[in-house]
Amino acid sequence: MNLLITNDDGISSAGIKALERVLGKSYNTYLIAPLKERSVTSMALTVFQGMRVERINDNHYIADGFPVDCVNIGLYAEIFPKIDFVISGINRGVNMGYDVHYSGTVGAAKHGALHGIPSLAVSSGRIDPEDGYEKEAELVLAFLEQYKSQIQSGEIWNLNFPPEVSGTGTISELVFTRLGRRRYSEKYEKKQIIEGVSEFQLNGSLLGHDEETGTDFEAYAQGKIPLTPIQLDLTEKNRLKELLTNR
């Protein structure tokens, strides 16, 4: 099976190196990643201008673009064989709840699904671990061995690892969840440049979430590994049915 590996943390990140190192033992891996940090870029795509791509060798490329650009090039620029599966990560920090709408990690997986390819987004609550995300990568390998046949064409699965990872190579702590409700409270710092022109710097979000059962947040807080199937179709089907019935 041919795996396309990308991320939004950039080519130098420990997470993508761990994925390639571990998954390469069992699969054909093809890596293309952004030249630099591209977090919080969702499904941004480079258009109206060219994009520089550097070939390291037949299996490794660097793109001066977004995560979605990397997937697009990997699928359609004829640099790799036919791709069977897209994996994005391992992200430095989790992507749960409504984070998935902003995440470049999830955005890359969504783009794979958009083109009919089963896709997995992987994130971790461990920040810069000494082992370089080796434990998470081993668990991704175990996950693929058990579940790859269940991920259908065009599906996206979102996997998040808690800070404490067993490292046993098993996925006994994996639970299937739904997305929770993330709450954001944005704060900007304003700096006046000249009269009438100011610079606004987002100083991070105060993040919270609703306490609900069955969500990725609940599983994560319990030290489990939440796995959430998500989809591209944003139609609110129940509401649509109601509108059609009552028209």
UniProtKB/Swiss-Prot annotation:
Details of cofactor binding: Binds 1 divalent metal cation per subunit.
Reaction(s) the record says it catalyses: a ribonucleoside 5'-phosphate + H2O = a ribonucleoside + phosphate
Superkingdom field: Bacteria
Cofactors (names): a divalent metal cation
Residue ranges of the TM segments: none
Keyword field contains Calcium: no
UniProt cross-references to Pfam families, sorted A to Z: SurE
Gene Ontology MF terms: 3'-nucleotidase activity; 5'-nucleotidase activity; exopolyphosphatase activity; metal ion binding; nucleotide binding
Keyword Hydrolase belongs to the record: yes
Gene Ontology CC, one term: cytoplasm
HAMAP family: SurE
Protein name as annotated: 5'-nucleotidase SurE
Lineage: Bacteria, Pseudomonadati, Spirochaetota, Spirochaetia, Leptospirales
